[in-house]
C-alpha cells in the first residue's frame, strides 16, 4: 500500500520561527514510517518556501535554536493553486519546475502569525488540500487574544479582566512616553488590579510580555505597551490573576467526534540561572533548563482536574476548534477556572506540554499524530 505523503511545514516569518523548527522535528520523528512519507518544506524568516534544506530530524533543543535557511542544494517551492495536492513544485536553477509529487495532507508545524492565524489554513482551503489542525476561523480567532476573549465571554467561559489598546492611535516616536498617563487612565477606569501583564494580542511563546507591578507607574506601563507593540499593534493589558497556570491538551479528530482532553499539567517554576524569575517567559520556556519542570497531572486535586478538562473542552468547542490545541487556564485558590488562551498549534518540542500530556495518559505521541493525520484525510 502506498504511503500517505505528508508535507511538514516548518520555520516561517513569526517570532516563534525556531520553535516551529523544533516542533517540526518532533512531528517528523512521530510519523509512523510504515504509514507516512514526510516531505519537509522550510519557510525562511523572510517567507521563502524551499525544499532540500537541512534535515529537521537532526534538530533538538539541547543543541540550541535552529533556523530554516536555504543551502546550496535548496530549491524554491512554487505552488500552483488550482492543482490541489499536485500543485507543489520545486524551481530548478534554469527556472524549470519539478513536481514534488502528490501531497496527500499538510502538517503545518508553524507557530504564530502566518502559520497559526488562519492565513496558511486559507491557502490550503483554496488549494483543496487537507491539513492538520484548526480551520481558518478558529485559527484566526485564537491567534488574537482579544477576539479569543470575546468568543469565550459570549460562551459564558470566564477570562481574566483586561483592556485592549490600539497602539496605532498613539505616538510611538517616544516609545509612548507621553501616552503613559492615558494608558493609566484606561487601566484605572476598568478597575484593573496589579500586577498587570501587558502582552501583544497576536504573538506566542511569551514574546513581548511584561509584568508591571508598581501601582500608578505610568512610565513603566508605557514602556511595557511599547515592548508589546513591537510584536503587534493590538496590545492587551490584563489584570494579573493570583492563580496557578494549568495547561490542558485537547484533540478533536473528526468533526462528528467529541473533543477529548488529556490530563492537565502545570509548568512549575524552579529558578532562573539569570534574570527575572517571576513568570514563564520565552527564556524560562526554552533556554534555561533549570528554570522549570512539568508536572502531569497537575497537583490540584481530582475535582479541579475534572473542571479544567471540562473547561478546556468547552473553550475549544466555543471557537469551533478542530485537530489539536492546548488550552491554558488559571486556577485560583478559591477553585475558579479561567481561560487564559488557546494555542491552536501548540509547541511540540521534547519539553512541551502537548506531547507529554498524552504520553502521561499512556497514549504515545506517534498515535496522536497518526490520528490527527487520518482525521484530516477523513
Curated annotation (Swiss-Prot):
Residues 149-374 form the ATP-grasp domain. The keyword Nucleotide-binding applies. PROSITE patterns: ATP_GRASP, DALA_DALA_LIGASE_1, DALA_DALA_LIGASE_2. Keywords: ATP-binding, Cell shape, Cell wall biogenesis/degradation, Cytoplasm, Ligase, Magnesium, Manganese, Metal-binding, Nucleotide-binding, Peptidoglycan synthesis. Its EC number is 6.3.2.4. The keyword Chaperone does not apply. One of its GO terms (biological process) is peptidoglycan biosynthetic process. Mg(2+) 2 binds at residues 341, 343. It comes from the Bacteria. Pathway: Cell wall biogenesis; peptidoglycan biosynthesis. One of its GO terms (molecular function) is metal ion binding. Belongs to the D-alanine--D-alanine ligase family. This is D-alanine--D-alanine ligase. It comes from Bifidobacterium animalis subsp. lactis (strain AD011). The lineage of its organism: Bacteria, Bacillati, Actinomycetota, Actinomycetes, Bifidobacteriales. The gene is ddl.
